Amino acid sequence: MHEQYQAPLPVNSPALPEPFYYLHNFRAVLAWIGERYADLLDDQERAFIAAFAELPEASQALLVRMVMRKGTLFREGKLAYAEIGDTRAAVQPLLALGWVDAQPTLELAQLFGLLKKDELSQLFRDHLGRANLRKDALLERLQPLFPEARRLAEWQADFAEPVYELRCMALCDRLRLMYFGNLWQDWSEFVLADLGIYRYESVEFSADSRGFRLRADVDAYLHLFDCRQRFDLGEPLEELLAGLPGEPYANPWLEGRRVKLLFQFAQHCEKQRDFDLAQRLYRQSSHPGARLRAIRSLERGERFAEAHALAREASCAPESDAERQGLARLLPRLQGKLGLPRQARAAAPEIDRLDLCLAFPSEPCSVEWAVREHLEEPGCAVHYVENGLINSLFGLLCWEAIFAAIPGAFFHPFHSAPADLHSADFRQRRAALFEACLGRLEDGSYRDAIRCRYRDKFGLQSPFVYWELLGEELLEQALDCLPAAHLRAWFERLLEDIPGNRAGLPDLIQFWPAQRRYRMVEVKGPGDRLQDNQLRWLQFCREREMPVAVCYVRWHVDD
């Protein structure tokens, strides 16, 4: 294919002025892990850290470049970097350590990932005739003819450009997991922080602050992550369930991941109409909503007596407002199926209704924005806030509690939220801090506290504050027009169930600054209906006589 391979000239990295920025970050991670996780490392991992420190700088940099790239297979020409220089020289120590392989065995799909279409067409010309197929169609045609993996030289003897396979990716992923406490964060966090794109709150935590206490916990996380990946790739559920621990993990955080995976497996079964397996998996899971889905699966499987018994049990102690709402629908229906007296449903508070017939927008815009434009008038400001305003005010007022250095909540510099944010004991572990923050609503100091946090923390990552939404005008109108008692009620509800209650708030908020009053408005276009979490928030507000309305929109189209 190539008579002689000539590597392209390397180019400078555009990311940061310091050419080895990524290497400095990787070294910092290794030092952090060595300081905090030495007791969780095995001999291979310790040897990796020690050997990495002894490598020439160019070899260190090349390895880190490969680790940060997508995949594990690279043509040499794709590894050309000005700061590294001669790629072939830099890779030699990595080959000697076995961290990189210069003779990888490639399946056909991997070969297709490396080569361009014209290279593939030339390589397989004897099998294609005159067919001019897309690359994916070409792979589909050739797959039955080449089921076995081969070395590159066996695929193409005269392919002159070296291909390298990274062999230590699993080890590096494990180190990344130990540092971040998860696998959804990656090495780009450092770059985004260095560039100022993301800025994080500085939390003081000690050297023993870490995400994992036991090596077995790291193993368990990786196992659950692998199960989820295999599930996404379509591996039979029976095989996955056989490898999933049947007993709860002692670590609450890992147990949360296990029961969530069971919940996701059960959802899959429910979609496949395997209601028996679905209800069994739901009942093995304590993930929020699992019990309600188990009842629903029993009902759909026409096991009405079992569904009714479980629903009665749940109604004695609902786990959340969402479950209470679902049970209020399910129980009367199940009672009807069983010929039992139907339980009367409590009457929901009357929600103010606003009906609008608006001219169809001449330019594309959302129905919420059209209503905002219609409602705004002199003396009345209208903002499209949805969940952003109340969450932001809560996040600013309670900043100290949210970012308190509670053990296990923060263990690296890139936390946008405490690791236990969704834990059942999140508030309890910070009870005094939250009470102090919320107490400002009682003594009137909350306005100054929120303004101070807005100035001091502006732009820092937060799980609650929508900086792009919360301009100073909106903030001041909210502080002037929203009663402290209403803020306290909303914030208390958020803390009761953060994952369940942080969404569902009305789309718009109207302010009448001169009168220091407000109204929240949920907007529904033609064919839209209120979602369950929206209904719960609307009911919550009306029960407390908070001004809220639902606006139903019809479009008027001129002939």
Curated annotation (Swiss-Prot):
Gene3D superfamilies listed in its UniProt record: 3.40.1350.10
Known catalytic reactions: Hydrolytically removes 5'-nucleotides successively from the 3'-hydroxy termini of 3'-hydroxy-terminated oligonucleotides
Domain VRR-NUC intervals: 443-555
Protein residues bound to Mn(2+) 2: E386, D507
Enzyme Commission code(s) on record: 3.1.4.1
Binding positions (Mn(2+) 1): D507, E522, V523
Cofactor binding annotation: Binds 2 magnesium or manganese ions per subunit.
GO molecular function: 5'-3' exonuclease activity; 5'-flap endonuclease activity; flap-structured DNA binding; magnesium ion binding; manganese ion binding; phosphodiesterase I activity
One GO term of the biological process aspect: interstrand cross-link repair
Result for mutant: Q534A: Loss of function
Cofactor: Mn(2+); Mg(2+)
Record keywords: DNA damage, DNA repair, Endonuclease, Exonuclease, Hydrolase, Magnesium, Manganese, Metal-binding, Nuclease
Disulfide bonds: none
Top-tier EC class: hydrolase
Function: Nuclease required for the repair of DNA interstrand cross-links (ICL). Acts as a 5'-3' exonuclease that anchors at a cut end of DNA and cleaves DNA successively at every third nucleotide, allowing to excise an ICL from one strand through flanking incisions. Also has endonuclease activity toward 5'-flaps.
Record family assignment: Belongs to the FAN1 family.
PANTHER family linked: FANCONI-ASSOCIATED NUCLEASE 1
Protein name: Fanconi-associated nuclease 1 homolog
Gene: fan1
